[in-house]
Amino acid sequence: MALGSALGIAAGACASDAIVSVPPDIQHRTVQVSVGQEIHITLGNVGPAEYESPPQISSPAISFLGVDVVPPFTPAGPTQQFRFKAVQRGVAAIHFRRLLGDSLVYTVDDTVVVR
């Protein structure tokens, strides 16, 4: 967690359909959600490297739904938004690997706590 400060992002318990959005400004986050909620994790890129899809997920507490390139569209590199669904109680570590070809450039590790 060299760059990371832990950030607890909590979602309202009554809003199980609400989307929990995690912005790209903080890396290595901890997110708390309820079963049924969707989680959007946004990661920015500088240069031609991109985050690998799907990312590595440590447990079945969440499922990977997909990834999209989202605004802002900059010449520096794409902004990627990864979408997940909280499917059962538990804790899942998500390991994002930023690759340039076969070379590892950077990693981000986020944790999702599903209540």
Language-model regions, residue ranges each:
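C-terminal motif of bacterial Sec signal peptides marking the signal peptidase cleavage site
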Residues: 11-13
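Short, solvent-exposed loop/linker segments at beta-strand-coil boundaries, enriched for Pro/Gly
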Residues: 48-72
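Short strand-edge motifs at loop-to-beta-strand transitions and within beta-strands
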Residues: 29, 80-82
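Short, exposed beta-strand-loop hairpins at the edges of beta-sheets
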Residues: 95-107
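C-terminal edge beta-strand
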Residues: 107-113
